[in-house]
């Protein structure tokens, strides 16, 4: 086994090992699990499970085989009205107002109603951003839901914040909004597919229901269920395709069974002789 000091070095070390053997002499296993998935597995916990945090670390309070019920987590929706001259919502449009709505916790309806923050003529962007941050902090949702938030709402708010030289702090940790991944395009089953940028919050979850297939089909409860089964945090899982979510579940199950997972398992299988076929 090869240990690395930082998870970000894992793929580089794996590529180095393979290249030393001219990509033929060595096999590499267990590189695929995401750092968060590996960390939660090592801690013996799953997303959305109850834990105790103490000086001794993180202790699970429930077993994986126990009957599980989705927890009640508070939710709020955020929508930014930013339209161009043709009335189309776009991140480059002028922000007129933002609406924050309490959606309850999945068991009972919201009691805090809606807050509308207007960008009136002559108002400074700094004042608008500060009021939005205060509203989110006061409502304090566990999950912030948007529709096209990764594509429109957050880019528009970030543009306004940067124009006034300030940060956008909508998470509980009071840190700047994190751009975890820029928009990328790749080929999938013969089609060119675009994966939108990923804007993450710290201390609360951002789920873009306008871009998440799993979120649209299964709702928040479905995301929680899949998150628990796969070991992938809900905020990350909402950006995955169904196929990637299934792969994550398989990897988690392999880790639990103590089975090594070949790296790049979608690579064409090497030729085997008769003896290898019998052993396999």
Predicted regions and their residues:
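The two-metal-ion catalytic cores of nucleic-acid processing enzymes
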Residues: 1-280
